[in-house]
Amino acid sequence: MIAGLLLSILLFSQAAPLETVVASLNNRAITYSEILQEGELLNIENNVPPETPLSPELKEKILRLIFFRIILSEEAREQEITVDEQLVRKSAENYMKNVYMKAFIKKYELTDFEFKTIIKMRLITDKMTTNFIEQKFPNGNKHSKEDEKKVIEDWENNLLKRQKVIIYSMP
């Protein structure tokens, strides 16, 4: 009887894993489940099954991407840069056409508001990045995708230098 009780406690304690904080950006904790959620959503966006395992290198890139999105969302708010709600709604509808999306939303128990907030952050990041590229290469100056990638990478690094970033080990 006691063995059964201990087994029950062990099983139930395994059902709800603790959140592991993998980083902090300006005192905002970033959890491992956020890395996994973002990774699954990136897989879905690229028409890859969401449960496809994430390599350690990809997890690091995802963490940087999360940092970048948070920073740009804050900068957009400060600069009063927004995206049209109709665009957010239309993008949400497009995401919902993906065969994996309903299961993703159910798995992470996302409300409609939370789902649209995720999409809105992506759209704001895209808009801020487009604005930055247009400033760096004005009047349609010719440039390669590599030039663009390098400029964005430098921008990300400079933005990160101005933040309080702590990175812990990732499972």
PLM regions and their residue ranges:
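Intrinsically disordered, low-complexity regions
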Residues: 4-5, 40, 141
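N-terminal targeting/tethering segments
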Residues: 14-119
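A C-terminal, polar beta->alpha supersecondary segment
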Residues: 106, 125-171
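Cell-wall glycan
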Residues: 121-123
